[in-house]
Amino acid sequence: VSSAASDVYKRQVQTIYQSFCKVGSFGDSSFAGFANYKKMFADPEVWQSLLNTFKYAIIEVPFSIAIALILAVFLNRKMHGRTIYRAIFFLPMVVAPAAVAMVWRWLYNSQFGLLNHILGTKIEWISNPKIAWISVAIIGVWSIIGYNMVLFLAGLQEIPKDYYEAADIDGASGVRAFFKITLPLLSPTVFFVLVTRVIGALQVFDLVYMVMDISNPALKKTESIVYLFYQYSFQNGNKGYGSAIVVLLLAVIMVLTVFQMIGQKKWVHYN
């Protein structure tokens, strides 16, 4: 574990150092000072990709958590086929990202896609710049629900049944019991899922890379900050500038995580 942690820190330091350098495709570098950061802060593409990433996270995080929590509450009850339902909802997590992208590209196809066939429309789900980012976020929600649900199920099974029996005696059941008992006792799990999903959503890459073509007119409205890093570092060979973009993302994640850690004191109950 310590070896793995040291490798992570080493790579972080190396990335930060590279952000101050002009790095070539073959690893040769020369110190460039704050040139990469000056360029980055003046680059509208960086801010557009950061905005795209925030928009994606605003949809993916709350919806994936809310839907997963509702499913977990229902699947935590005694019901026929409970194990099968759990497996079905968790399935997207174990499916290869390439297969997920292929299925959703077919669903979203404006000419012969299933969604347009059902709706009887010709909506350009992933090529219309106004709605493409929403379409990509929907895939993200669908893909992560199963993972969130499993975590919530684990948390629900740790809640003693005595609380619910006492609530029944007092006449508090159903929705009232959920908000008075389930949610407060599950708040540490909800907080963990929230923090990890915010970090995960801000690092979205594979969905954009596999669903959106380079020639797609909506690409600039959907490309994430990590996708932009990939473009500069690996496609354009500008690893110094790519490292500066990653440092920006790291700073954003750290700030948001600190705010979440401060805010959790008001609503997370550990006792």
Question: Can you annotate each of these PLM segments?
Answer:
Residues 3-271:
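A structural signal for multi-pass alpha-helical bundles of membrane permease subunits
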